[in-house]
């Protein structure tokens, strides 16, 4: 399961990082982008065993972004991506709480703007539902995954 979550994080990262963040002022965009950039640097340049403390700090920053920009779907998407990365680092059953939190953030983002970050929320949710085990362990469901990815 640890490897699957790492792959999931990579796919989410690939789909979302190259997307433009929109509908925010340039200064707001820069603040959200800085957190996203810190996450990208951590994810790609540090060994996995060194990522967790930084990801936890980024998670707190993402929570602050949500408080500062409660209507910005992009802040929720970044928070969801960070939670996915933390889940990949934790692995096993302890990661399930993180992926549920990630799903919650992404669903909130999609309620605000389903096309934020070029519709990355659909890709994130599709991957979460596809990669995770189904009931009774988690919420994985291939049919739901397909509905988000199509």
Predicted regions and their residues:
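Bacterial N-terminal signal peptides
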Residues: 6-18
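N-terminal leader/linker segments that initiate helical-solenoid repeat arrays
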Residues: 21-60
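Short coil/turn linking the two alpha-helices of tandem helical-hairpin repeats
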Residues: 35-47, 85-94, 117, 128-137
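Alpha-helical solenoid scaffolds that mediate protein-protein interactions
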Residues: 42, 58, 65, 87, ...
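Helix-turn-helix repeat elements of alpha-solenoid scaffolds
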Residues: 47-63, 95-105, 138-143
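Mid-chain, structured segments of secreted extracytoplasmic proteins
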Residues: 59-101
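Residue-level recognition of tetratricopeptide repeat
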Residues: 72, 116-118
């Amino acid at each position: 399961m640890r490897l699957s979550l790492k792959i999931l994080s990579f796919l989410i990262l690939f789909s979302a990082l190259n997307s433009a963040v929109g509908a925010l002022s340039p200064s707001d965009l820069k603040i959200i982008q800085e957190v996203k950039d810190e996450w990208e640097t951590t994810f790609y340049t540090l060994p996995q065993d060194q990522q967790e403390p930084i990801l936890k700090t980024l998670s707190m920053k993402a929570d602050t972004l949500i408080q500062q920009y409660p209507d910005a779907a992009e802040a929720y998407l970044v928070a969801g991506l960070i939670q996915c990365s933390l889940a990949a680092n934790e692995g096993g059953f302890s990661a399930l709480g993180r992926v549920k939190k990630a799903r919650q953030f992404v669903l909130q983002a999609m309620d605000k703007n389903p096309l934020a970050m070029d519709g990355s929320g659909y890709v994130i949710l599709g991957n979460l539902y596809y990669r995770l085990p189904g009931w009774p362990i988690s919420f994985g469901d291939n049919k739901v995954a397909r509905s988000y990815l199509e």
